[in-house]
């Protein structure tokens, strides 16, 4: 396999940090090209970026350190460091390997709390997708996972679908029918999450598998994006921009990738929190979203119905 990849962590300036990666991986069902753009910015209000990310195969992950808590930035950095140490660039882990790495990341964040004398709990969200093998390497899957209210979406060129379920107080109210999704966006408890890496001795992540097939695209983000832009806004930007690959890398004053464009739009909308975005595009055998949009949408919907985590 070949790759060109870079790890991104935090950035403490408004312009943020931009990363572009491309990886070519040989899988049982063909040659896969993985293209990711990632961007992070501190936002327009805060002074420290507590988000961290990695965008290199096999990991495409965002961690959002718990704002207002001790060591929020160190918590998110610890998660990314542990995951990349245990699931190194170029590897294709098993689902058990990924789960073990998430457990180790939780232990690493718990250690931060212990080092601080347990005055305050360190914690972070975690969301992402990993390229994982099963059946002794005979099959390959996307292993999706999340803890907290950072999100992962699928994008087929027209339809943006949230795959993860927020672990938050307002999501529980929505699930109970007490409030609408629109009301949840402005609810006074919208920043309260019900799960976090490092919050408890055992981490409870939602995890499920999707097939790696044809042309696929994922959006992975911290809530700094989704609290400034609704899903329609995000879908509009994805459709207008067209993909992860920079459209005009020589235009220094303009966003050069869809991830950069999304971060810039969230900043313009208020930028009240740190903002981190990864857009991952996967293609096997040269497939494109235009070629397989309808087929992929139907297949993904059916597979998600069978595999989505349930309470």
Spans of features found by a protein language model:
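PP2C/PPM-type serine/threonine phosphatase catalytic domain
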Residues: 1-311
């Amino acid at each position: 396999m070949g790759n060109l990849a870079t790890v991104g962590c935090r950035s403490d300036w408004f312009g943020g940090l931009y990363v572009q990666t491309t990886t070519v991986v040989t899988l049982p069902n063909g040659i896969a090209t993985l293209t990711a753009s990632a961007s992070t910015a501190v936002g327009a209000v805060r002074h420290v970026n507590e988000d961290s990310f990695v965008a290199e195969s096999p990991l495409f992950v965002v961690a959002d350190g718990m704002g207002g808590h001790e060591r929020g930035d160190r918590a998110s950095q610890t998660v990314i460091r542990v995951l990349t140490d245990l699931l190194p660039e170029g590897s294709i882990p098993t689902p058990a390997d990924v789960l073990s790495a998430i457990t180790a990341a939780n232990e690493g964040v718990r250690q931060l709390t212990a080092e601080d004398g347990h005055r305050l709990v360190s914690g972070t969200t975690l969301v992402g997708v990993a390229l994982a093998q099963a059946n002794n390497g005979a099959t390959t899957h996307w292993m999706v996972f999340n803890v907290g209210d950072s999100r992962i979406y699928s994008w087929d060129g027209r339809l943006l679908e949230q795959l993860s379920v927020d672990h938050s107080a307002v999501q529980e109210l929505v699930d109970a029918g007490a409030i609408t999704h629109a009301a949840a966006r402005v609810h006074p408890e919208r920043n309260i999450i019900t799960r976090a890496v490092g919050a408890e001795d055992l981490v409870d992540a939602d995890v499920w598998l999707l097939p790696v097939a044809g042309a696929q695209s994922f959006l992975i983000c911290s809530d700094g994006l989704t609290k400034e832009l609704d899903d329609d806004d995000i879908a509009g930007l994805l459709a207008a921009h067209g993909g992860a690959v920079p459209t005009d890398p020589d235009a220094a004053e303009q966003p050069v990738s869809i991830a950069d464009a999304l971060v810039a739009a969230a900043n313009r909308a208020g930028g009240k929190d740190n903002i981190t975005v990864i857009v991952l595009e996967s293609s096997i055998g040269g497939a494109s979203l235009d070629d397989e949009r309808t087929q992929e949408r139907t297949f993904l919907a059916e597979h998600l119905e069978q595999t989505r985590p349930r309470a």
